[in-house]
Regions:
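Extended alpha-helical interface modules used as scaffolds for assembling large macromolecular complexes
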Residues: 1, 5-13, 18-23, 132-136, ...
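AAA+/P-loop NTPase substrate/partner-engagement loops
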Residues: 97, 106-162
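Extended, charged/polar low-complexity intrinsically disordered regions
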Residues: 1-60, 325
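Structural recognition of the conserved hydrophobic beta-strand(s) that form the central parallel beta-sheet
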Residues: 149-151, 182-183, 194-205, 219-221
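N-terminal pre-Walker A segment at the start of P-loop NTPase domains
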Residues: 62-82
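Phosphate-binding P-loop
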Residues: 81-91
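The conserved Walker
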Residues: 100
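Glycine- and acidic
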Residues: 35-39, 49-65, 89-97, 151-158, ...
């Protein structure tokens, strides 16, 4: 599988599918040729770690409410197996919702998908909206410890297309967030059970409409044309991810301890607003982005004052996402109550 592996000598390495990132300590690591053909490239080799991170953070400051959450989710997905081992499985989908042409897909590719599919020379893992539930299941279960994009899941074309896409999106949410195991056929016969192991990002033009679906999402509203794209966005993003993964591999146990301490002190059920489930999502995203900030500070890319400024930006981004989710949940709950009331009134009229 892609993702983290512990070697017999106690070291941890990250497998992209085609590469091993991290010091194996002299152990030869062979990768199966059946793995996804993904790689992570660092084309900023002439830049020091500090310079790469400073460039990266400057780019995030263009659209902090959107890009911070994409990056936090990318880090959360990279460390999915570590979080799960600590008792925090990934139980949400990051949903970028906004009008067509606002830059959702470009942002997701540049800042949420640092890997490249070498067979297509394209950001990966990513696919256009899938037309069947088995296709979604197979895609979401193929990748481990990385974010993956399902693009244009909910688009507003015909009413029938919208109904089908909403149904598939709802299935995707439950397959990912509820940790559902499903049986698939083996090539040689028999079956095996799979579940979602990727950190899914989906894009769409309209939000989910059931409160139970919304609680499985972290909503990122893209309500304007995103600005300031630069030609080297993806190059710097991939270089940052490469160096950050090397740092994580070297400090794997201490990072695990940081996550355990951060989330053991975080009590989602002690927070009144947004419900425990949403608060848990936000707590995990906050922890993930702060791991990146700690790395940036450790290499001198930011100082304590800048660290505090970035934490404030993070807080604002999380607050905006939580507010969007709460507003949508309240809206659809009101509509559901109104619809039920109308049905009761109509039924009473028909009896008289």
């Amino acid at each position: 599988r892609t993702g983290w592996a512990k070697l017999p000598n106690g070291r941890h390495i990250y497998n992209t599918g085609m590469q091993v990132i991290g010091d194996a300590g002299g152990i030869e690591v062979k990768l199966s040729d059946t793995l996804p053909q993904l790689e992570l490239t660092d084309r900023c080799t002439e830049m020091e770690d500090k310079q790469v991170l400073q460039s990266y953070l400057r780019k995030l400051s263009r659209e902090p409410d959107i890009l911070i959450l994409l990056v936090a989710h990318m880090v959360r997905s990279l460390l999915a197996s570590m979080f799960e081992r600590l008792g925090f499985p990934l139980r949400y989908i990051l949903y970028l919702v906004g009008v067509q042409g606002s830059g959702k897909t470009t942002a997701a590719n540049d800042f949420g998908l640092p890997f490249t599919d070498v067979t297509q020379n394209a950001p990966a893992p990513a696919t256009r909206a899938l037309s069947s539930k088995p296709a979604v299941r197979d895609f979401a279960a193929e990748y481990r410890d990385m974010s993956a994009l399902l693009d244009d899941v909910c688009t507003s074309s015909s009413a029938e297309t919208r109904r089908i896409s909403t149904d598939i999106a709802a299935y995707t949410l439950r397959f990912a967030a509820d940790r559902i195991y499903e049986a698939i056929s083996r090539p040689g016969g028999g079956q095996r059970k799979v579940r979602c192991t990727a950190g899914l990002v989906i894009t769409g033009e309209f939000p989910m409409q059931k409160p139970s679906d919304l609680t499985r999402c972290v909503i990122v509203e893209v309500d304007h044309q995103m600005r300031g794209k630069e030609a080297d966005d993806r190059m710097v993003s991939s270089a940052t991810a490469t160096r950050f993964i090397k740092y994580l591999a070297e400090h794997f146990d201490s990072v695990s301890d940081e996550i355990r301490m951060a989330l053991s002190n975080f009590r989602a059920d002690a927070v009144e607003e947004g419900g425990p489930r949403q608060q848990q999502h936000m707590g995990e995203l906050s922890c993930s982005f702060q791991l990146l900030l700690e790395y940036a500070r450790s290499i001198g890319a930011i100082d304590d004052l800048e660290m505090a400024e970035w934490r404030l930006r993070l807080q604002n981004a999380l607050g905006r996402a939580l507010s969007a989710n709460m507003c949508l949940t309240a809206k659809f709950e009101r509509e559901n109550v109104s619809n039920v009331a109308k049905i009761i009134v109509d039924a009473m009229k028909s009896e008289t």
